[in-house]
Design a protein with these regions (language model features):
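Short amphipathic alpha-helix used as the core "switch/output" element in two-component signaling
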Residues: 39, 61-73
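Charged docking surfaces used in two-component/phosphorelay signaling
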Residues: 15-23
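Acidic catalytic/metal-coordinating carboxylates
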Residues: 33, 59-62
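Short hydrophobic/Thr-rich beta-strand motif most characteristic of the beta2 strand and flanking loop
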Residues: 25-33, 40
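C-terminal output helix
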Residues: 104-113
Length: 120
């Protein structure tokens, strides 16, 4: 299956997404720190990045821009509990494939990941 990076400032949120996607057969790398996640992306290819919008030092949108400059083919799903029109538009402008609102249902998460990985 796919290699997926998950970045959220909340450890439990990372673990929830990790557990759901590993059960679906994906290899998941979870991070709560932006620098660690970007360092991983620089050294390892991932198929998909799942990014929370609200992080510790930067926004998920800023991290998305950095990931796209490092590995343009990496697909991305943005997650947030605080959706705004601005972050939605900016996420899509920078190349996000999906923008989901938390809390997200496990089945919806699996379906969204499968669709994004297929290119839809």
């Amino acid at each position: 299956m796919a290699k997926v990076l998950v970045l959220d400032d909340v450890f439990d949120a990372v673990n929830l997404v990790k557990r759901v996607l590993e059960a679906a057969g994906h290899e998941v790398f979870g991070f709560t720190d932006e620098k660690d996640a970007l360092g991983f992306i620089k050294k390892n290819q991932v198929d998909l990045a799942i990014l929370d919008i609200k992080l510790k030092q930067k926004t998920g949108v800023e991290i998305l821009a950095e990931i796209k400059s490092i590995a343009p083919a990496t697909r991305a799903i943005m997650l947030t509990a605080y959706p705004t029109v601005e972050t939605t538009q900016e996420s899509f402008r920078l190349g996000a494939s999906e923008y989901c609102v938390k809390p997200i249902d496990n089945d919806v998460l699996e379906e969204t990941v499968a669709r994004v990985l297929k290119g839809g």
